[in-house]
């Protein structure tokens, strides 16, 4: 009896098939370093089982195998589609919610911008409709439906950098990333300026310049890329060194409110500051702006409050270590599987000689 792990990725099809999570780096080449380390810890907790974990990027229609012992792990479905196979597997772990979250945080947008965001939600909801109908049919037929558990998206950049004490960091705030990820001549290009990601990041960019003009003493390291793919193709070492060397991470939303940047910041005790954050991280130590226009005043005031800065920094490190660290998430997944009867807590057997 052996726990099996399979990769089913449209990004790296050459790596698809069974893989061994005995090494923490098992999914690095597939672009999933965080989840690979989670599976590394989970595998050690599970021991030998008859479970099969299928790791997929965003395929919600088919899996290479089905059964009550199959666990689907969906890592990149930002469109929050329902799976076609919820009645065919034992459990589903996914990195994004089950309903499109594009409208989160659009309270400050103009009506025309709300319309653009609403279009994206409606589009993605319709894309997920076939799966939702299949699940509804299964429920009507009283078939067993797999539970869904949301897990953090974690980090993408994972190179090792030296820790810099908070008071010794050179930059007050840092941002490196794209403003919009749409390709030229794509069907959605005309809607780019109405989409939540582009809108919020343009507002952030303007707020950065406003902050530097009003408070020239504030040091902000910023650079912009043409797309998300260009961002992840750039030097991870340089990106993480700058993140580590900053007190705040400017954290605008992406295509959805969830971003790698948020977790990469917490991991280093860098304080995320922004306007839109997913509901799943409520309670985490971040600074929420009412709108990006408030950045200048908020940042300058916080930088003067050294005690508050230290508290936020320490809380960020603690939150990562107790809520989002790879081993913590693995233990949470293991507990959920145990509650479902799909895994069993190991008990230590003590011999009479050991007791004596």
Residue ranges of each PLM-predicted region?
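Short basic/hydrophobic patches in alpha-helices and adjacent helix-turn junctions
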Residues: 248, 264, 301-304, 318
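Catalytic cores of eukaryotic secretory-pathway lumenal/extracellular enzymes that build
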Residues: 277-278, 283, 287, 292-295, ...
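Nucleotide-sugar donor-binding catalytic core of glycosyltransferases
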Residues: 1-260, 274-279, 283-284, 327, ...
């Amino acid at each position: 009896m052996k726990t099996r792990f399979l990769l089913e990725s449209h990004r790296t099809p050459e790596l698809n098939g069974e893989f061994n999570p005995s090494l923490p780096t098992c999914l690095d080449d597939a672009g999933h370093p965080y989840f690979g380390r989670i599976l590394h810890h989970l595998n050690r907790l599970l021991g030998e089982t008859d479970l099969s974990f299928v790791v997929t990027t965003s395929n919600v229609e088919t899996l290479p195998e089905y059964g009550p012992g199959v666990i689907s792990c969906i890592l990149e479905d930002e469109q929050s589609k329902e799976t076609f196979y919820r009645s065919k597997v034992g459990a589903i772990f996914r990195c994004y919610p089950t309903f499109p979250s594009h409208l989160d945080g659009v309270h400050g947008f103009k009506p025309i911008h709300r319309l653009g965001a609403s279009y994206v939600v409606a589009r993605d909801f319709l894309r997920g409709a076939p799966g939702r109908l299949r699940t509804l049919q299964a429920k009507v037929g009283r078939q067993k439906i797999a539970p869904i558990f949301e897990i953090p998206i974690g980090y993408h950049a994972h190179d090792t950098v030296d820790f810099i004490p908070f008071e010794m960091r050179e930059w007050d705030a840092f941002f490196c990333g794209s403003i919009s990820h749409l390709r030229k001549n794509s069907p959605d290009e005309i809607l780019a300026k109405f989409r939540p990601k582009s809108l919020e990041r343009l507002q952030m960019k303007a707020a950065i310049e406003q902050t530097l003009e009003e408070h020239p003493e504030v040091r902000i390291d910023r650079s912009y890329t043409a797309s998300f793919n260009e961002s992840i193709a750039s030097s991870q070492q340089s990106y993480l060194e700058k993140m580590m060397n900053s007190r705040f991470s400017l954290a605008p939303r992406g295509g959805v409110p969830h971003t790698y940047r948020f977790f990469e910041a917490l991991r280093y005790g860098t304080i995320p500051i922004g306007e839109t954050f997913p509901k799943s991280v409520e309670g985490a130590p971040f600074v929420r702006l009412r709108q990006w226009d408030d950045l200048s005043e908020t940042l300058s005031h916080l930088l003067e409050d050294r005690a508050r800065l230290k508290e936020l920094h320490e809380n960020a490190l603690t939150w990562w270590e107790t809520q989002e660290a790879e081993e913590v998430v693995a233990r949470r997944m293991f507990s959920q599987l145990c509650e479902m009867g799909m895994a069993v807590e190991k008990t230590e057997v003590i011999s009479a000689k050991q007791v004596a």
